């Protein structure tokens, strides 16, 4: 099947591109986006797994070293079953040591997204910090309007 990238313009006339990824292709592109981040990375993922963190910790360390602000929005560990609770607690401690700001949510938190430099928006069904075996989909939208729309919709300015 041919991969397609859709380029368009939004209501303001600004150009944007949109591309779909499955769980097999997501991380390659997402890691490139993280490596290219210039100022800020926001990741919202309700679950955290030790196995997935093994892939992400090296890039998080590089981002911290480059003084890129990284915010992780996730569930409070107490809201997880025991298996995920300890993995979440371990990752949150690791984030804090690296200088990454974890923002803990309460009450059925289940959104999965990332905003990079407020210019790239990733959204879909894939838990960025925990996905291992499940079949998922993520859409990458490159266009400041969409990233800022999500940032404003989530009222993130109150927390960052």
Place the predicted regions along the sequence by residue.
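Short acidic active-site motifs
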Residues: 29
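Primarily the HKD phosphodiesterase
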Residues: 32-97
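Short solvent-exposed loop/turn micro-motifs enriched in small/polar/acidic residues
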Residues: 105-108, 132
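Short, well-ordered alpha-helix to beta-strand connector turns
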Residues: 37-38, 110, 118
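Signature of lipid phosphatidyltransferase scaffolds
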Residues: 1-8, 18, 120-160
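Short acidic-hydrophobic, aromatic-tinged amphipathic segments that line or gate anion-handling sites
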Residues: 20-22, 102-106
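Short beta-strand scaffold segments in enzyme catalytic cores
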Residues: 112-115, 139
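Acidic/glycine-enriched edge-of-secondary-structure segments
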Residues: 3-24, 42-48
